[in-house]
Amino acid sequence: MYPEESRGSGGVATVDFLEGLMTMTAPTPAPTPLYSHSTTGCYSAPLDAHGPLSDGSLQSLGSGPTSPLVFVPSSPRLSPFMHPPSHHYLETTSTPVYRSSHQPVPREDQCGTRDEAYSVGELGAGAGGFEITKNTRFCAVCSDYASGYHYGVWSCEGCKAFFKRSIQGHNDYMCPATNQCTIDKNRRKSCQACRLRKCYEVGMMKGGMRKDRGRVLRREKHGPAQRQTSQNLPTHKASPQDGRKRAMSSSSTSGPGGRSSLNNMPPDQVLLLLQGAEPPILCSRQKMSRPYTEVTIMTLLTSMADKELVHMITWAKKLPGFLQLSLHDQVLLLESSWLEVLMIGLIWRSIQCPGKLIFEEDLILDRNEGTCVEGMAEIFDMLLATVRFRVLKLKPEEFVCLKAIILLNSGAFSFCTGTMEPLHDSVAVQHMLDTITDALIFHISHFGCSAQQQSRRQAQLLLLLSHIRHMSNKGMEHLYSMKCKNKVPLYDLLLEMLDAHRIHRPVKPSQSWSQGDRDSPTASSTSSRGGGGGDDEGASSAGSSSGPQGSHESPRRENLSRAPKGPGVLQYRGSHSDCTRIP
C-alpha cells in the first residue's frame, strides 16, 4: 500500500491512505538538493529537529519504490509501554521521504531488560525486514514462556493461576494414571494432580513471593556482572536430582529468619514458626477394594510417601535458618532423615487411635491388614507401639520440636562413617539445633514442674528418637526389597531418596578397595547400627539393582576403586568406568 499525494494550495499536502485522508503542512523545500547522484548516502534529518535515527529509519534512494512518497518503517514497536507513540513528518523535497520520528529507547531504560532483549538488525534482513533474537525465561512447570516470578519460581500466567486456585481452595486432585503424567505446554491441563505435584517439586510455595521484586530491575542495571553470569548458565533438561535441588533452592529472602536473626529470636516465636510450618494432612481419594493385597497396600503407601516428600521439602524450607544453609547441606539433611520425619508424623497422627495407623484421612490400616505384606508385620508392631507417646502425653509443641531435631541431627556425625561428605557448615546446623532444643526446654519449663521433672521429661522425649531411628532402618530395608522385587511402582522422588540412602550406607573395607591396592594401607569404615541390617545384605541388595549377582560377586568387588583420603562419595554403577567420585 502506497500513499497518494495531492498538492493543495498554501503548501498543504494531503496524503490519501486506504483508511482515510491525512492533511499535513509541509515545510518550504530547501533551495539546494539533499542528495547527489554521485553519492549513495541516506537522508538524515537535523539532529536538533528529530534526534538520532535508528538503523530501521534509514532508506537508500536507489532501493525505494517509484512513488513520490517513500514510506520507511520505524523500529518494531514491541509494546505501547516500552515505545511511545510515533509522530510522522512529511518532507517535501525532490524525493520526499515519509519517516517515523520514533527514537530508540536505551536498553537500560526498557522494562524487563533481564528477561527480554531484542536486537534489531539492518533493514531487509530476514522475514519482514528485521532480525529479532529473543532470550526469555521459561516456566519451571510447563516450559512455556514465563510471565514473571510467582510463588518462588519463574512461571507462566496459567501455572501461576492454577497454583493460586489450588492453595486457596479445591486441591484434592486425583491422577487417573500413575502420578507420572508429563506436564508441558500442551498437556498441562490433562492432569491437575500431576501439575500440582510438579508445582511443589519445582519449588512453588505459598509464601514464595519475593519482597524485593520491585527493585530487581534497578539492581540488575547496576550489576552487569551478575546479569552476565545468569545469562551464561547452561540450559539443559533437568535430571531428577536437579529437579529436587531446584525445588529446594529458592530465594533466601522468602524464608523466615536467618542465622543472624536466630540469635535474637525468642523461643516462643520459634515454636510459632515450627507450628506454622506443619504440612496439611493428605487425602488419597483412591478407592481400593478390601481386603487389601500386598501390591494394593504398597501402591497406596508409596504413593502417599511420594506426596508427603513434596510437602516435607516445603516444611523444611520454612524452618528458621534452613534456607541460609548451602544447597549441599539441605539435600544431605533431607536424604538422611526423610523416612524418620515421615514416621514421626505417622505416629503423631495415630496417637489417639490405639491399634490403628492413620496414613491419610481416608487410609487407616490395622495390624491384620498389614500382615498381607511380607515383612510389614514387624514394622506395624513397632509403629503401633505409640503407647510410649501416649503415656508421655506428647504436646503439639513438643512434636514439632522433635521433628525438627530429627532433621537437623541426621547429618551431625556423618563424617564418622566416612561414606558421605560432611556438612559444609556444621556450625550453622548445630546453631539451629541448639535453637530448637532451647525452644523445647522453654516449653517444658512452663509445665509448672520442678527442675528435676523438667530434665527427666526432656530426656524421655529425646529417647523416643532412637526408637524412631530403628523403625526407619527397618522400613528402609523393606522399601529396598520391594524395589528389587519390582512389584510396585516407585515414583521419582521416592526412588531418588531411597537410592541416596543406600549410597550413604557404610560398607566393609573388603568391598571398598580393589585388588591392585593391596600394598597400600587401608582405612576401615565403621559399621553403624543406624544403617539397619548386615553389611553383606546391604551389599548384595545394592548389587541387585546396578550390578551382577550370585557368581559374579568377585568381579563386582574388583571393579571398586580405592578412594583417596579426603571428603568424597564413591558411587558404583556396575563397571569400572561407572565408578565415579563426587567431590
From Swiss-Prot:
<keyword id="KW-0863">Zinc-finger</keyword>
<dbReference type="InterPro" id="IPR024178">
    <property type="entry name" value="Est_rcpt/est-rel_rcp"/>
</dbReference>
<dbReference type="Pfam" id="PF02159">
    <property type="entry name" value="Oest_recep"/>
</dbReference>
<dbReference type="GO" id="GO:0005496">
    <property type="term" value="F:steroid binding"/>
</dbReference>
<comment type="subunit">
    <text>Binds DNA as a homodimer. Can form a heterodimer with ER-beta.</text>
</comment>
<feature type="zinc finger region" description="NR C4-type">
    <location>
        <begin position="139"/>
        <end position="159"/>
    </location>
</feature>
<dbReference type="GO" id="GO:0008270">
    <property type="term" value="F:zinc ion binding"/>
</dbReference>
<feature type="domain" description="NR LBD">
    <location>
        <begin position="266"/>
        <end position="501"/>
    </location>
</feature>
<dbReference type="InterPro" id="IPR035500">
    <property type="entry name" value="NHR-like_dom_sf"/>
</dbReference>
<dbReference type="InterPro" id="IPR046944">
    <property type="entry name" value="Estr_rcpt_N"/>
</dbReference>
<feature type="region of interest" description="Disordered">
    <location>
        <begin position="506"/>
        <end position="583"/>
    </location>
</feature>
<keyword id="KW-0754">Steroid-binding</keyword>
<keyword id="KW-0238">DNA-binding</keyword>
<feature type="DNA-binding region" description="Nuclear receptor">
    <location>
        <begin position="139"/>
        <end position="204"/>
    </location>
</feature>
<dbReference type="GO" id="GO:0005634">
    <property type="term" value="C:nucleus"/>
</dbReference>
<feature type="region of interest" description="Modulating">
    <location>
        <begin position="1"/>
        <end position="138"/>
    </location>
</feature>
<dbReference type="InterPro" id="IPR001723">
    <property type="entry name" value="Nuclear_hrmn_rcpt"/>
</dbReference>
<feature type="compositionally biased region" description="Low complexity">
    <location>
        <begin position="539"/>
        <end position="551"/>
    </location>
</feature>
<dbReference type="Pfam" id="PF00104">
    <property type="entry name" value="Hormone_recep"/>
</dbReference>
<feature type="zinc finger region" description="NR C4-type">
    <location>
        <begin position="175"/>
        <end position="199"/>
    </location>
</feature>
<dbReference type="InterPro" id="IPR001628">
    <property type="entry name" value="Znf_hrmn_rcpt"/>
</dbReference>
<dbReference type="GO" id="GO:0043565">
    <property type="term" value="F:sequence-specific DNA binding"/>
</dbReference>
<dbReference type="InterPro" id="IPR000536">
    <property type="entry name" value="Nucl_hrmn_rcpt_lig-bd"/>
</dbReference>
<dbReference type="InterPro" id="IPR001292">
    <property type="entry name" value="Estr_rcpt"/>
</dbReference>
<feature type="region of interest" description="Disordered">
    <location>
        <begin position="220"/>
        <end position="263"/>
    </location>
</feature>
<protein>
    <recommendedName>
        <fullName>Estrogen receptor</fullName>
    </recommendedName>
</protein>
<dbReference type="InterPro" id="IPR013088">
    <property type="entry name" value="Znf_NHR/GATA"/>
</dbReference>
<dbReference type="Pfam" id="PF00105">
    <property type="entry name" value="zf-C4"/>
</dbReference>
<keyword id="KW-0804">Transcription</keyword>
<keyword id="KW-0862">Zinc</keyword>
<comment type="function">
    <text>The steroid hormones and their receptors are involved in the regulation of eukaryotic gene expression and affect cellular proliferation and differentiation in target tissues.</text>
</comment>
<dbReference type="GO" id="GO:0042562">
    <property type="term" value="F:hormone binding"/>
</dbReference>
<feature type="region of interest" description="Hinge">
    <location>
        <begin position="205"/>
        <end position="265"/>
    </location>
</feature>
<keyword id="KW-0479">Metal-binding</keyword>
<keyword id="KW-0539">Nucleus</keyword>
<keyword id="KW-0446">Lipid-binding</keyword>
<comment type="similarity">
    <text>Belongs to the nuclear hormone receptor family. NR3 subfamily.</text>
</comment>
<keyword id="KW-0805">Transcription regulation</keyword>
<dbReference type="InterPro" id="IPR050200">
    <property type="entry name" value="Nuclear_hormone_rcpt_NR3"/>
</dbReference>
<dbReference type="GO" id="GO:0030284">
    <property type="term" value="F:nuclear estrogen receptor activity"/>
</dbReference>
<keyword id="KW-0675">Receptor</keyword>
